[in-house]
């Protein structure tokens, strides 16, 4: 069975219904460390304005007091990749695929199933906070590595920010899809292309119930097709040709 890893997104959009929120035990030290920061320190930790930090302080306080609403993570995150992922009108099989084979890597919650109920928050691995003297990446690394050890065939749709939490010995075993567009005879890629294509790729996987590496190579989605020439054992290239 294939296991997919995807990143979080800064943009969030709460979609009813909401649920009671329960913070995982491993996340509590992070919440406590953030709660100790002054508004100015919080702004520096997030690299945001004081006004934006005030909003985040209220969110953190609500989480700490058990007053936050929670939403399925794949519905709450609303970045470009998530907007290009099929999230509504899923069949039971597609819903099972999304909830049992796709996991979200979070700097606040750890590695969670896509349907895990989470609260609105602003947090990533660039957040400047230490937990017991450790950076967020080092704090989560043992748990991330254990996940990689327990899941043999990982398909990584992670950016370097999230990928680098894992030890390199595990990263080397993954398959990492790469997405490029042909323009004026040249192959181009940038973050917008990649984010949109990740969502479309994952949609194709769940719609076709893809379970093997060979099946990944047969996929076509949003104009992208697998390219044998460029691909290696661990990097699968998907190219969108000029129309």
Swiss-Prot record:
<dbReference type="GO" id="GO:0033194">
    <property type="term" value="P:response to hydroperoxide"/>
</dbReference>
<dbReference type="Pfam" id="PF03883">
    <property type="entry name" value="H2O2_YaaD"/>
</dbReference>
<protein>
    <recommendedName>
        <fullName>UPF0246 protein Sez_1855</fullName>
    </recommendedName>
</protein>
<dbReference type="GO" id="GO:0005829">
    <property type="term" value="C:cytosol"/>
</dbReference>
<comment type="similarity">
    <text>Belongs to the UPF0246 family.</text>
</comment>
<dbReference type="InterPro" id="IPR005583">
    <property type="entry name" value="YaaA"/>
</dbReference>
